[in-house]
Curated annotation (Swiss-Prot):
This protein's record includes keyword Manganese: no
Superkingdom field: Bacteria
Organism the protein comes from: Bacillus subtilis (strain 168)
Pfam families per UniProt: Germane
Name the UniProt record assigns to this protein: Spore germination protein GerM
Species lineage: Bacteria, Bacillati, Bacillota, Bacilli, Bacillales
Length: 366
């Protein structure tokens, strides 16, 4: 298991804004909601400008600059794009896209190599779909999105086949109106991918998993998928990577299973990191009520060797919340240690309220 070292802590650009009590972790705005459109701005034509003094001129330039910045902010909206990182993982990056009425179609267009994403592509990431691919998206009332691609869609490398399916599925299902996805090429529904022949289920969804880890699994039918979140890093930041593992069907408590997988950590060859101690354990069965799960840990959950501090690291809490809220019945997470709610975050703030899942993750600047 790879532990997160001090270099990663210094490089973090995400966690300073995290762990607000009762708040989301990265981006609190819902993906399906748009920011307010820009208001009409009236400009006054100053015919006497030549007589204005220098101070007034500077003030006018400053006002214009502020207006331009406001217009730029109000003309974009943050979207999750599932891109491929340097380790080959499919990972969400939340990036500013121009406002569009065709939001789902636009999101897929930003997955195309050499397309508009090139101007905002984060360091260490690459686009997923082959260059020059075009797409239309038809969203049905039952929550199915039909993504119909052009012939260029076939021009991908075989090793990217599953990554493409996962990227398209997870990018589209960020929208509240989309639960499942079907793929087409020029109107013809795909039952398998065109290059490597990977079978495609009738309705692709997040239940199919992402960044599948099947090493050591002899019988897939005797297991079920469970997605957990580990850490990865690039030159200037760290980010969260979803990994779908296979859990034995004899395990009926997926919440406990998820915590055990987080404590176990990623495989040594994965290139992923963790801030979890291997000694972290739940001291009682998780309790779920009204979408809130309450977890009671042993003291190994603390990120400080000083027991008086009772601090949980932001990376640990974020991984827990992202992991558990992938499960449909969980909306927020409360954490206790040996039955007591005395934890604080890295800012020293008490975690008195449950922490909810963000609508968007990995919102670090590009």
């Amino acid at each position: 298991m790879l532990k997160k070292g001090p270099a990663v802590i210094g490089a973090t650009c995400l966690t300073s804004a995290l762990l607000l009590s009762g708040c989301g972790l990265f981006q609190s705005d819902k993906a399906a909601e748009e920011i307010d459109p820009p208001q009409d701005v009236t400009f006054v034509n100053d015919e006497a400008g030549a007589n204005s003094n220098t101070t007034a001129a500077k003030k006018t330039e400053s006002e214009k600059s502020d207006t331009a910045k406001a217009d730029q902010a109000s003309s974009t909206v943050m979207r999750e794009l599932y891109l491929i990182d340097k380790n080959g993982y499919v990972v969400a990056q939340t990036l500013p896209l121009p406002k569009s009425e065709s939001t789902a179609k636009q999101a897929l267009e930003y997955l195309v190599q050499g397309g508009p994403v090139s101007e905002i592509l984060p360091n260490g990431f690459r686009a997923v779909l082959p260059a020059d691919t075009t797409v239309n998206v038809d969203i049905k009332k039952d929550g199915t999105a039909i993504a119909d691609f052009s012939n260029e869609f076939k021009n991908y490398k075989k090793e990217d086949e599953q990554k493409i399916v996962q990227s398209v599925t997870w990018t589209l299902t960020q929208f509240s109106s989309i639960d499942k996805v079907k793929l087409r090429i020029n109107g013809h529904e795909l039952k398998e991918m065109p290059v490597g022949g990977t079978p495609i289920s009738d309705d692709l969804s997040r239940k199919d998993g992402i960044n599948l880890e099947t090493a050591g699994v002899n019988d897939l039918t005797a297991t079920h998928p469970l997605t957990v979140y580990y850490l990865a890093e690039n030159e200037d930041s760290e980010y969260y990577v979803p990994v779908t593992k296979r859990i034995d069907n004899s395990e009926k408590d997926d919440i406990t299973a998820a915590i055990n997988e987080l404590a176990k950590g990623p495989s040594k060859v994965s290139g992923l990191l963790t801030d979890f101690s291997e000694d972290v354990k739940l001291v009682s069965k998780p309790k779920i009520k009204d979408g809130r799960v309450t977890l009671d840990f042993n003291q190994s959950i603390f990120g400080s060797a000083d027991e008086k501090t009772k601090m949980i690291s932001s990376e640990v809490l974020n991984s827990i919340v992202l992991t558990l809220t992938e499960q449909p019945d969980v909306k927020s997470v409360s954490v206790k240690v040996n039955g007591k709610s005395e934890l604080v975050n890295e800012k020293g703030e008490k975690l008195t309220e449950p922490v909810s899942r963000p609508s968007q993750v990995n919102t670090g600047s590009f």
